């Protein structure tokens, strides 16, 4: 978050940097670096044109806070993602699956994020709909049907290539990417292959489509690895799906702090 000293407008500093420079993933950078980029590139407030050089860049909580109940109400937050509903119900869902792994749960529903500067038509809203699949596996026992998508060709943009001065896309097959460790989890590789086939069937232009790996600085705290399916629209790369290997982060935290056994 950066605020204009003249008109008081608030802006997402990373978005200002991305719009004014060749930096694609400013969200992954520390606030100090974003502030330096704002100063070095003479970025001004979009609302009034006042230079923003020297203004502090601060973290901002994207969760909507609210009060639950009357009187001395308990604090609560609107969910920023739909996934936690699945994790909270994991003990019951496992019973429904007769205790057998792997099993998957799909859902669709609303999520809420207190965006600093909503923009991009329907691409960045404060209330939006998410659809997702959470697949629960035993990483030591369960293997995906990788052979079904082993020969599917994908265009990858790994973190190593993003950080290299002359980095470029890696066009390869799902099988080769998993075998060579470009994609760390065979389960992630499997779902990237399934998604690639689906996007091709529905008519996505594969010349303007890629899977981009999250940089370490932008990867969510719960994710051991994460890739985004992105499509180029009017010169901007737009995330249309995320593929995260969450490990046992969510279930272990609910087990640690909740009353049920996870």
Region annotations inferred by a language model:
Residues 1-262:
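TRNA-recognition modules of translation machinery and tRNA-sensing kinases, especially anticodon-binding
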């Amino acid at each position: 978050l950066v605020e204009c000293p003249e008109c008081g407008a608030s802006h997402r500093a990373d978005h200002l940097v991305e719009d004014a420079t060749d930096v694609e993933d400013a969200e992954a950078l520390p606030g100090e670096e974003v502030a330096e980029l704002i100063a070095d590139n003479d970025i001004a407030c979009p609302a009034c044109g006042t230079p923003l050089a020297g203004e502090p860049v601060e973290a901002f909580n994207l969760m909507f806070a609210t009060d639950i109940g009357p009187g001395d109400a308990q604090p609560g937050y609107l969910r920023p993602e739909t996934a936690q509903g699945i994790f909270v119900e994991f003990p019951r869902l496992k019973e429904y699956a007769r205790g057998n792994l792997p099993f998957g749960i799909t859902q669709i529903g609303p999520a809420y994020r207190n965006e600093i500067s909503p923009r991009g038509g329907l691409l960045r809203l404060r209330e939006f709909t998410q659809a997702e699949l959470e697949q629960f596996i035993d990483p030591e026992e369960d293997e995906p049907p990788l052979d079904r998508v082993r020969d599917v060709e994908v265009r990858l943009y790994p973190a190593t290539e993003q950080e290299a001065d002359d980095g470029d896309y890696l066009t390869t097959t799902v099988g080769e990417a998993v075998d060579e460790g470009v994609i760390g989890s065979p389960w992630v590789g499997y779902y990237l292959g399934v998604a690639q086939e689906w996007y091709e069937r529905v008519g996505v232009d594969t010349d303007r489509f890629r899977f981009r790996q999250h940089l370490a600085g932008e990867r969510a705290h719960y994710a051991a690895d994460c890739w985004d399916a992105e499509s180029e629209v009017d010169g901007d790369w737009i995330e249309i799906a995320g593929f995260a290997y969450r490990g046992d982060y969510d279930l272990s935290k609910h087990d640690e702090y909740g009353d049920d056994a996870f």
